[in-house]
Amino acid sequence: MERGGGGSGTGSRPEGTARGTSLPGKIAEPGAVRTSQPNYRPQGMEGFLKSDERQRLAKERREEREKCLAAREQQILEKQKRARLQYEKQMEERWRKLEEQRQREDQKRAAVEEKRKQKLREEEERLEAMMRRSLERTQQLELKKKYSWGAPLAIGPGGHDACDKLSTSTMSLPKPTEPPMNKRLSSSTVAISYSPDRVFHVCPRLAPLGPLNPSYKSSPTRNIEKKKATSTSTSGAGDVGKEALSGGEASLVEKVKRGQRTATSLPVVNFGSPLRRCEFSGGIPKRPSSPVISKTATKAYPQSPKTTKPPYPGSPVKYRLPALSGQDMPKRKAEKEKSNKEREGTLAQQAAGPQGEEALEKHVVDKHASEKHAAAAGGKAENSAALGKPTAGTTDAGEAAKILAEKRRQARLQKEQEEQERLEKEEQDRLEREELKRKAEEERLRLEEEARKQEEERKRQEEEKKKQEGEEKRKAGEEAKRKAEEELLLKEKQEQEKQEKAMIEKQKEAAETKAREVAEQMRLEREQIMLQIEQERLERKKRIDEIMKRTRKSDVSPQVKKEDPKVGVQPAVCVEKKTKLVVPNKMEINGLNTCQEVNGVDHAAPETYPQDIFSNGLKPAGGLIHLDALDGKSNSLDDSTEEVQSMDVSPVSKEELISIPEFSPVSEMIPGVSLDQNGTGNARALQDLLDFTGPPTFPKRSSENLSLDDCNKNLIEGFNSPGQETPLNTFC
């Protein structure tokens, strides 16, 4: 629109210009008087139309500008809106990414925590399995020891039967680790030992003597103490490594050694007759494991046959051997358990590796197999005991049932006690493991905190170091900048000084050049002046020579009458307005040695010289001087200064010249010279001449203010201008 408006404006201009050109053409007619008024009206109309057009165009431009501004504001608002939407979208995307990252981190953290918990559970299971395997292995070893405990103590013809009898007697002892099974086995072995079949196979020589039987009977209190010992040993059987470090280990080892020495120190004796042994074979008790069994054994003792032969006499030690072995059995058993526990503790410590675990698993499998076998054997033995107890000495089935129920109750109680102890031990182990895990977690957290603190300290030190390095760099940069600025200022100062020096040098050179030029100009002027003065001097000399020639040619009588001095002088003197006396006196004017020209009037008297040679080196001219009128121009000052006027003057003697004191500057300069030596004739004639020419117009000057080099100065100062001079009467 602006361009269109501009085009319309430009298009309207030629119309206005054409209109303006056509209107003055109509007005400019000959005879039109009022030409100004018709010219003003069309110009005003044209200006009015142009102003309307300009206002319209300006209004259109304003509207267009407002539209453009509104459109631009709308675009800016739309752009801001788009930018805000884009920013919000970016922020939402960023928050979404942050949320996803946080969720991923939470999932990762949860997975790590779950994995850690899984590892802890696996570790707990592994430790529990190890503990269980170690316990099972300990029980298996104790079971093996229980079965292998009855070794042959004597060598004889019935050795195998004795070994079987001893093994069956030892099997009757209850074990602390497996009380139900051992009790069943013990009861079954007791029942078997008292059964007719078993008695039928027993060798009669191994039976002990009758009088020694009461010593082998065990009291109920003794059986209770044995149960307590077995329960305490059972409670300590689960502990793998702690019992090995107990304080009573040395005493137990000593007891084991002492029992072994007593067992090995027993002498081997010969048994009695077979008949006697067979007589006592049915009634000898085999150290029962419970008071009930001992009672049955005592009841069965009197039923032995009396027709048997008396036994051979033997040593009491022989018959006490089973009792001694029965007394030493718990000690040996406890010692073996302690040694096995120590060995199991070392094995449990070494079982952390995979090979140890595999070996433990193999032992567990073997132990389970042996437990199953032992359980089956125990069940069979229990059944056989239930069947054989009435035949072994119990006549009442109810009493046997009570005994069996009591045994089962005791086995159940012992099993519950062992289970409770096992649970307590597992709980204690779990608490210990949790405590260890808690301590390990605390240690890990402490180490992480220390590492975090160290990392923060390291970062802080690095930041401080970086900050210090940045400060040092900034200071170094500022110092370098300051030095650069100082060097720049110094260079600028040096450059300025150099420029000033160069300017001063240039000024000096210019001054010297100017002085040389001035001196050269003055020298040239002086030379020119000297040449001019020399030329003037030569001209004056020529004129003086001419004057002298004319004066010599004129034949004037030497005797002139005093009464007629004017008549003799008037026809010969033709004086112009100005005369010029040249005295070759040298003086300095503006530093130049020039010859001063002394200008005087016509009536100036010639200088008088008191001596032949004055201080300026000039000699007075002798003879008469005739002043004649010259044909020069007397009205111009240049001619009066440049030309020397000559006149015919009669020669005056030295004395006559000295006799004029009024007008001689030499008289003032040299006051000691007397002027009254000659007569007054010449003075009178000169006075008349001065009266004819007129009085002097220059003032007198004192001799104090004059020097020898300035003797003609009062003449120069007394020089009158042409307007002030009086015209002289010249005689033609």
Swiss-Prot record:
Keyword terms of this UniProt record: Acetylation, Cell projection, Coiled coil, Cytoplasm, Cytoskeleton
Q: Provide one Gene Ontology cellular component.
A: microtubule
Gene Ontology terms describing biological process: axon development; microtubule cytoskeleton organization
* GO molecular function term, any single one: kinesin binding
Q: Name one Pfam family in it.
A: MAP7
- Stretches of Basic and acidic residues bias are at 49-64, 329-345, 359-374, 404-509
**Keyword Acetylation belongs to the record:** yes
List the biased-composition ranges (Low complexity).
347-357, 375-386
The subcellular location is: Cytoplasm, Cytoskeleton, Microtubule organizing center, Centrosome; Midbody; Cytoplasm, Cytoskeleton; Cell projection, Neuron projection
Q: Would you tell me the protein name for this molecule?
A: MAP7 domain-containing protein 2
Organism encoding this protein: Homo sapiens (Human)
